[in-house]
């Protein structure tokens, strides 16, 4: 994703 804690594309960040 776009955050450092988001290593997969899940709805936790805007992108």
Curated annotation (Swiss-Prot):
The cysteine framework is III (CC-C-C-CC). It is found in: Secreted. Belongs to the conotoxin M superfamily. Expressed by the venom duct. One of its GO terms (molecular function) is toxin activity. Keywords: Disulfide bond, Hydroxylation, Secreted, Toxin. It comes from Conus quercinus. The modification 4-hydroxyproline is found at residue 11. This is Conotoxin QcIIIB. GO terms for cellular component: extracellular region.
């Amino acid at each position: 994703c776009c955050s450092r804690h988001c290593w997969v594309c899940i709805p936790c960040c805007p992108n």
